[in-house]
From Swiss-Prot:
Organism: Homo sapiens
Name of the protein in its database record: Tyrosine-protein kinase STYK1
Expressing tissues: Widely expressed. Highly expressed in brain, placenta and prostate. Undetectable in most normal lung tissues, widely expressed in lung cancers.
InterPro entries per record: Kinase-like_dom_sf (IPR011009), Prot_kinase_dom (IPR000719), RTK (IPR050122), Ser-Thr/Tyr_kinase_cat_dom (IPR001245), Tyr_kinase_AS (IPR008266)
The entry's keywords: ATP-binding, Kinase, Membrane, Nucleotide-binding, Proto-oncogene, Transferase, Transmembrane, Transmembrane helix, Tyrosine-protein kinase
Described purpose of this protein according to its UniProt entry: Probable tyrosine protein-kinase, which has strong transforming capabilities on a variety of cell lines. When overexpressed, it can also induce tumor cell invasion as well as metastasis in distant organs. May act by activating both MAP kinase and phosphatidylinositol 3'-kinases (PI3K) pathways.
Membrane-spanning residues: 26-46
Key word Cell inner membrane present: no
Amino acid sequence: MGMTRMLLECSLSDKLCVIQEKQYEVIIVPTLLVTIFLILLGVILWLFIREQRTQQQRSGPQGIAPVPPPRDLSWEAGHGGNVALPLKETSVENFLGATTPALAKLQVPREQLSEVLEQICSGSCGPIFRANMNTGDPSKPKSVILKALKEPAGLHEVQDFLGRIQFHQYLGKHKNLVQLEGCCTEKLPLYMVLEDVAQGDLLSFLWTCRRDVMTMDGLLYDLTEKQVYHIGKQVLLALEFLQEKHLFHGDVAARNILMQSDLTAKLCGLGLAYEVYTRGAISSTQTIPLKWLAPERLLLRPASIRADVWSFGILLYEMVTLGAPPYPEVPPTSILEHLQRRKIMKRPSSCTHTMYSIMKSCWRWREADRPSPRELRLRLEAAIKTADDEAVLQVPELVVPELYAAVAGIRVESLFYNYSML
């Protein structure tokens, strides 16, 4: 009160001045209260917005399962137990001895595997072999794929290899994913035992369909519109399954789909899904061909199952053109600029308007505007009812792998049969 009188130069007997003083206080106090309220409101709004952005980075658009938190597989033992082994103080042998009980149900006795192993290629973890597994009936051995861990392997490599096996345990079985038959992990060398999908990858199948060949090894090498939908539906079922597990694939393409003789499709190449499972995100060190990536992936933004939907549209293009590279007129390094201009691929001459409409829905710029895998599957199931199952897709030109690799932006070596489950 004294300071206010001093500012207004009031005397105690000056009633008019005292009135002015009180009016001044009436103005100042509410103003201060309003200012403090606005500051607090601003801080609360800022905290709320920051939290919302954090949640958006952890999940995709509405209806998309959130990415699971990173998992430390070095401590997981299954059966509700933990393996508490500090890596710096543990040998490979001790680590295997501690983790093998957790994988007991998956162990395949090594004597059940044939002594002669046929090496078919090299994978990211080590050599990949084809072998026969004893099923109890000597007349019916089962052909399997052995993914070996390259030697010598350090403790971290062993931990990662076992983590991939644990990843299969988490996934469980699905008819449109390559199945884990078991493992051999009680001692070195370590093997992951997978089912053998002997017909190879879909891209090679599509290229063979271009040749004037009716059958080869009992498989009919031709493709109709209805069969394209049939294969696409199976891929979407696999993507739905991954979405239910709070995962996404990250590299949907014909080269990552294996085919059986009855045209059963099995999605493979789950290395990126494994990264999401263990780390909660995709590593920046993974190299994926740019022409299959959704815009948000090219812009290095958080990815989701809707990025797989974009790639699925590219897969439909691959099938209907019998394995042509996407965006043939665009250099791989210019694909982002091309897409930023809202340009998409034109309808191939062998593609119906119905199928092209489905493709375009996959290539919407905003991921929230794209259909979910389930919505896509329902559209494919509706299209199958009226699809042509008589006319065979025909492309007269044969594929030159070196030219394809240059246009597609991939390594030529990756075009050779590579059983890449993980």
